[in-house]
């Protein structure tokens, strides 16, 4: 029997893009990367755990902010190279900028326009030194 992790087409760095989507509304919240370990832990712990390329380590979403993503369903695309996580976003904030979604800008009239409000000041979410904006 084939291991379910072996069915995924990992990129040259051993990563796969993972899109977090609100399980109720369908809104795309964010995109991050997963490796085999983070995906296996996500399934085991039923919460989103990503691979931070900038920090070179596992990133348990919400470990600093408290904005944990509880996983309701995982989906693999037809090419087996993108994962969607249907999540419940605790605290209603997925983005390190303090917004609901990382996709808060719309292309309009030749420019990117911010259309979503900041729900909570990032300085109030993260301790000093966190690289937000």
Swiss-Prot record:
The species this protein was found in: Azotobacter vinelandii (strain DJ / ATCC BAA-1303)
Catalysed reactions, semicolon-separated: 1-(5-phospho-beta-D-ribosyl)-5'-AMP + H2O = 1-(5-phospho-beta-D-ribosyl)-5-[(5-phospho-beta-D-ribosylamino)methylideneamino]imidazole-4-carboxamide
Protein name as annotated: Phosphoribosyl-AMP cyclohydrolase
Pfam families: PRA-CH (PF01502)
InterPro entries registered for this protein in UniProt: PRA-CH, PRib_AMP_CycHydrolase_dom, PRib_AMP_CycHydrolase_sf
Gene name in the database record: hisI
Pathway: Amino-acid biosynthesis; L-histidine biosynthesis; L-histidine from 5-phospho-alpha-D-ribose 1-diphosphate: step 3/9
UniProt function note: Catalyzes the hydrolysis of the adenine ring of phosphoribosyl-AMP.
Alphabetical list of SUPFAM superfamilies matching this protein: HisI-like (SSF141734)
Binding site for Mg(2+): 77, 79, 81
Keyword match Protease: no
Cofactor-binding details, from the entry: Binds 1 Mg(2+) ion per subunit.
Major place of residence: cytoplasm
Enzyme class at the top of the EC tree: hydrolase
Example of a GO cellular component annotation carried by this entry: cytoplasm
């Amino acid at each position: 029997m084939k291991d379910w992790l072996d069915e995924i087409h990992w990129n040259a760095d051993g990563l796969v893009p993972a899109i977090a989507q609100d399980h109720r509304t369908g809104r795309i919240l964010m995109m991050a990367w997963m490796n085999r370990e983070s995906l296996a832990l996500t399934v085991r712990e039923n919460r989103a755990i990503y691979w931070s390329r900038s920090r070179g380590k596992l990133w348990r979403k919400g470990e600093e902010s408290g904005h944990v993503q509880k996983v309701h369903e995982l989906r693999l695309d037809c090419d087996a190279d993108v994962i969607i996580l249907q999540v419940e976003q605790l605290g209603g904030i997925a983005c390190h900028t303090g917004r609901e979604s990382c996709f808060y800008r719309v292309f309009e009239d030749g420019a990117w326009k911010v259309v979503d409000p900041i729900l909570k000041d990032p300085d109030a979410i993260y301790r000093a030194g966190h690289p937000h904006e």
